[in-house]
């Protein structure tokens, strides 16, 4: 997913809902400047210990202040915050360049159909339930968001 997202070394990337760091590890290996956002205090502490070179925010992802410079998001956020998160990321003034978000497949399809003036939204890779531990009750897809030029 990180390779498909086109993450480049030195690029600022948010991992929202970082959990135990599965995506974070790939982002670090890609050379990204990672900001991991995690609501669970134990997981946030574990992320700090496991990845000392990144910034970890113990915070509600829907309440964080987005970076004031261009950034990407590569994340598997909690499904319950998908709509609020997309509203924030796509809001006027956001410096979002691109996002690759693992979402509930129905939500990804809904947003891909919607019109967005400043961004293109498409459904990318489909992920079956068995791709996750523990498996969710729904299938997932990557929502690919790119800023229009």
Residue ranges of predicted features:
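Catalytic cores of RNA-modifying enzymes
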Residues: 1-149
């Amino acid at each position: 997913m990180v390779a498909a997202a086109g993450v480049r070394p030195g690029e600022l990337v948010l991992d929202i809902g970082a959990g135990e760091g599965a995506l974070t590890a790939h982002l670090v290996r890609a050379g990204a400047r990672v900001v991991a956002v995690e609501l669970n205090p134990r997981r946030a502490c574990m992320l700090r210990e496991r990845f000392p070179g990144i910034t970890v925010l113990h915070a509600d992802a829907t309440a964080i202040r987005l970076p004031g410079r261009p950034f990407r998001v590569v994340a598997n956020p909690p499904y319950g915050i998908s709509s609020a998160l997309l509203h924030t990321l796509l809001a006027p003034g956001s410096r979002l360049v691109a996002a690759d978000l693992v979402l509930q497949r129905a939500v990804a399809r809904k947003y891909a159909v919607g019109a967005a003036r400043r961004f293109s939204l498409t459904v990318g890779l489909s992920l079956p339930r068995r791709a996750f531990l523990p498996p969710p009750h729904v299938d997932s897809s990557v929502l690919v968001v790119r800023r229009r030029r």
